[in-house]
Each structure stands twice: as structure tokens, then as C-alpha cells.
């Protein structure tokens, strides 16, 4: 080939990471294809979350929003930057292991798949995503629906993958009530502003507390009228929900404290510094900042 031919090759399109034999050279040959498929679908989910946050858009190429404090975001929306697939209006995405919110990450991933590939093949595509994730990212679970598998990936594995992808400097931050996972949500650091925590409380945490309480009351009534194995199952469900309720109440107290402080972040300080400003409201603080959470 001559020089002009070489000049026509856009080097950014050449990547050994798309070659499973190179990318997974330390793995057994028979596992490489499945690993590539699983990783590719994990990356698709990450991209769809980027579209949900407004970082990316189906209507524009490249990085669409990466300013500070949500500034200029409303203008982008007004000029139609997110027409095909609307970005989330507050940059707070509930990441729940059950269906407590209509607009949680799992339902928005489903909406994204529907928008891009159409209603006709929606179930087929969800099945393919779920099967692909089970090739490596998570273990298969018998009798689980495709959407439940995707939800399980999102609530148990997505954050670990995101931390790895961004080398412990995440751009989507995981707010977490604790080990019971009573409430978790992702916040896009470029859209975070000093009103984000107050909104997280009023729009998500406080309504969820009421929902938990209503469900506990309902289960208490059902326990009274049940016996044997059914009563045992209902009690187990109630006790699990009570643990979540107590964890969430404690999280809400701490969240209110930090929301009242109206904390700002300065992107120039970097993720490591900014991530440490929220005490133990965020997950994996020590892994990111190098220090245990500092409670203010």
C-alpha cells in the first residue's frame, strides 16, 4: 500500500479491543467469544445510562453534556438535543433491585432498547441482552425474566463495572442507603448541583419510605390471616422490608443533614476530592478517596 492509502485509514477506528483473541488473551480460547459478547452488552447498557443522564444522545454525536452544576442543560433540551430519547430531567436515576419507581434505570434501559430497535423486536432484544450478560457478567438464574436479569445486573454488577471502566474515578456516582440496598441511585457528576440532594429526598426517598411502610402494614394484616408455610413466607417478606425501612429512615436523616448544607462541587478538584464531601451517603468512599467516609 502507498502512503495515501495509509493516510485514509482513520486510526481511531482500529482497535485491538474488538479482537477477542487479543483482548482476552489470558483466558481460555473457548471462553473468549462469550466474554466479548457479555462485555459488549454491558457497554451498551453503560451507553444507554449515558443517554439517560444526557451525557450522550441518540440525536447528536460524541459527548453532548459535560459541563458543571447542570448549567446549560435546559437549553440543550429546549433545542431538541434529546428529542429521540429524552434525558432524565434531574440526573438522578433510581437503581433498585425491585420495581419501586416507574423511571428507574431498568425501565429506562427497556425504553432505550424499544426506541433504538423498535417495539416489534423488543422482547427478543431484551432476551438477547439478558442471555449475553449471563455469559460472563452475572450468573444465570433459573426462571428469571429477561428484564429481571437486566435489573439484577444493574443492581449488583453495573457499579463494579463502572468503577473498573473509569479506574475508580466514576462519572456516575452511587448514592446508597447501605447493605440492605433500601435505596440506591446514580447521579451524573456533571449534572449534580447544590439542590440535587434535596430533590433526591423529596422525589425519591420520602415517597419510598411511605411505600415501604404501606407494604409492611399490608403484610402485617396478611400474616394475621395466614398459617403454616404461607405465614412463614409473609413474615420473612415483612422482616426483610422492615430492615430496608429502618435503613432508609437512617439514610433519610443523614441525607436531610447534607441536603441542608447545599454542597457544591468543583470539577477542577477531581473526583477523588469531590466524592469525599458526602460522608457515607455514597458507596465505596474509601476505594475512591483513599480514606474512610468523613462524617460532618
Question: Model features per residue range: what roles?
Answer:
Residues 3-296:
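Terminal accessory regions of large proteins
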